[in-house]
């Protein structure tokens, strides 16, 4: 692990426009990862445009989420949960989930996953 730590601003990190089946209007920034000294973990920031969404999917790793701004829903195991700035969630490994921005507002959320979960 880095001795110095990391302090930065999201606006200084390049946005990767996500593409693929079930992805609409999603950008990703990798804020902290093993490259910055956080071995085994990755903290990403996702920006979902109004009406956009991540794919409905599951995977073999958990993730922790915190909503930085905006509004939307998190679908987990067949139920939609409202999200707004300050909301947080833990999605266990293997649980089907999807983030959706409101039709009239974007959604920005932090997602922390094990290193192998960042793709």
Task: Give the location of each predicted region.
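A short, N-terminal "cap"/entry segment at the start of jelly-roll beta-barrel domains
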Residues: 1-40
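Short histidine-centered beta-strand/loop micro-motifs
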Residues: 34, 53-59, 100-102
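Conserved short histidine dyad/triad with adjacent acidic residue
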Residues: 44-59, 93
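Histidine-centered metal-chelating micro-motifs
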Residues: 53-55, 73, 89, 93-99
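Glycine- and acidic-residue-biased ligand/ion/polar-headgroup-sensing regions
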Residues: 62-72, 77
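Short acidic-glycine-tyrosine-enriched beta hairpin
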Residues: 79-93
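Ligand-binding loop in jelly-roll beta-barrel domains
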Residues: 93-119
């Amino acid at each position: 692990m880095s001795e110095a730590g990391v302090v930065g601003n999201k606006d200084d990190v390049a946005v990767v426009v996500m593409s693929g089946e079930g992805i609409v209007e999603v950008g990703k920034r990798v804020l902290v990862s093993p490259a910055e000294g956080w071995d085994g973990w990755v903290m990403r920031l996702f920006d979902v445009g109004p009406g956009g969404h991540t794919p409905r999917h599951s995977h073999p790793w958990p993730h922790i989420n915190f909503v930085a701004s905006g509004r939307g829903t998190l679908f987990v195991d067949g139920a939609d949960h409202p999200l707004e700035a300050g909301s947080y969630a833990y999605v266990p490994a293997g649980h089907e989930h999807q983030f959706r921005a409101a039709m009239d507002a974007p959604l920005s959320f932090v997602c922390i996953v094990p290193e192998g979960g960042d793709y």
